[in-house]
């Protein structure tokens, strides 16, 4: 919120750069050796998040170029590892809003600028669906109708999908 009140107040490219440099610092300081030794690394909100959250700020006819830019910048120029598998946990914003209201006990003021902006959240979901299709991500549907699936069910579905991707035994 320090750069504006709305996600669109900061350009997709500037925001992506901030997050990419933060990822670079994390990689070089904390997990580069593990990665290079062959460890399985699970990351929440890796470079693919830049694609989803920042691309949603752009006109649709610029999405392919933005995906290429993020991938070139992060993987080629910064030297960050490219993910072998990306999982997108899909949930309609209407369902996530219900969960947030519960988390914050109905106090809408506790939501951050992104959580408050349902137009932005819908745009992010649209950009995520596009990126998932274009980049071959695994998609796990985390809602049934107007309700979130139980975490245990999401976990089972995720493990089943991942079993084929990374040779897990479930």
Give the role of each language-model region:
Residues 1-72, 76-78:
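ATP-dependent small-molecule kinase phosphotransfer cores
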Residues 33, 41, 84, 168-169:
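Short, polar/charged, Gly/Pro-enriched helix-capping and turn/loop motifs at alpha-helix termini
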Residues 36-37, 81-82, 133:
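Short loop/turn elements that form and flank the Walker-type P-loop nucleotide-binding site
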Residues 42, 85-87, 138-140:
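Hydrophobic/aromatic beta-strand patches that form the interior of the parallel beta-sheet core
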Residues 45, 90, 143:
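Short secondary-structure boundary segments
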Residues 48-126:
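A glycine- and Lys/Arg-enriched "phosphate-lid" helix/loop adjacent to the NTP-binding pocket
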Residues 94-170:
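NTP-dependent small-molecule kinase module
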